[in-house]
Amino acid sequence: MAKKYFGTDGVRGEVGQFPITPDFVLKLGYAAGQVLVQHDTDQKPTVLIGKDTRISGYMLEAALVAGFTAAGVNVVQTGPLPTPGVAYLTRALRLSAGVMISASHNAYSDNGIKFFAEGGVKLSDEIELEIEAKIDEEMKTQPSARLGRARRISGADDRYIEFCKSTFPSHSDLRGLKLVIDTANGAGYGVAPKVFHELGAQVVSIGDEPNGYNINEKCGATYTKTLQAAVLQHEADYGIALDGDGDRLMMVDKNGKVYDGDSLIYVIAKARAREGINIGGVVGTVMTNMAMEIALKEQGVDFCRAKVGDRYVLEQLNQRSWLIGGEASGHILCMDKHNTGDGIISALQVLAALQTLNQDLATVCADWQPYPQTMINVRIQKGQKWQEASKDVLAEVEKELEGKGRVVLRASGTEPVVRVMVEARQADWARDGAERIASAIGSL
């Protein structure tokens, strides 16, 4: 059954436009609360709610709290905390569920609601459908004796900081390294610099002055120019960029070169292979560069592709019992460290890997050069038959690139666009193919 409200990563949209309105989020909290009460009959469920730094987070948090407590669910509020921190605390505190209020890398004018089940794992499709089925039902507030309570907890940041630090090798530290940390004026501003500082690094913190409106604005993992300039200015060894909710990572070396998720996954996997750690293999996506796949196999590391989206990478990792996976966008999963993507922990694993290999980022990543990719986003209207419109041109381009490249077309799960990606050994082949396919789709 198709989902009505949940996308690939929860419920997301522009604030003030359906479904990111106070009245809908109230109903969403109430519906989710009803499902929790039905599934947790032994005791009153408790939900953890975290958020990033968007101004709308206050409004949406209040609506969620009202919905959950009206359904008879207790609520624990952390304030600003990265998404992986919410997942961790949901598990560590043995709570019934966790909720993150964030639109990740989007502008402040967007927001979203992401749920975690007991244990800090993402909700199953079945539970999301159960919640959706109850959203349109009439709200019936529990009797006063059964209402939930809401409270804020102190020390959430500190618990998450200690957890992140525990994933770094106990016999080592970061002394001697100068790092620039860009937290995108987002959820990680209060925790990320402390993690690296407490492990011994000299830290320069930027993107750490959120005002409710500047999250992801010319900073963070989706805009690395600010970090690149800061690394050069401060003569730092590396720069680390998170996105607004702290689950993505990009890194910059001392020369200002940017390393995306693919490169960082390769570094981690190569070091684990060198140490003789059996990671099973690496899960990438249909967007992962072909050159990386070849380089991993040369290191004796198996590789497979999942659909785009960290939830699909996670599904493949769980099915195969593999440990490492992720996307070029900076979502990186190290399953032996955390059960969800975590920008801070991923950066620690990269730095630990570089110590293991006794090399810098540039040297390790020189093992492979990405095939040139051209990515074009084509806006579409709901119901447009873009697959039919692009069928003939797609067949032509795929035939031309056989053995020399590949094509990936996919509809975004969060916005009305089709992403056209063409990868080839030569940049002009990729650019020409992508433009032809995008033109065919755009002609609708």
UniProtKB/Swiss-Prot annotation:
One of its GO terms (molecular function) is phosphomannomutase activity. The keyword Magnesium applies. It is an enzyme of class 5 (isomerase). Binds 1 Mg(2+) ion per subunit. It catalyses: alpha-D-glucosamine 1-phosphate = D-glucosamine 6-phosphate. The keyword Mitochondrion does not apply. Activated by phosphorylation. Mg(2+) binds at S104, D243, D245, D247. One of its GO terms (biological process) is UDP-N-acetylglucosamine biosynthetic process. The modification Phosphoserine is found at S104. Its cofactor is Mg(2+). Its EC number is 5.4.2.10. This is Phosphoglucosamine mutase. The gene is glmM.
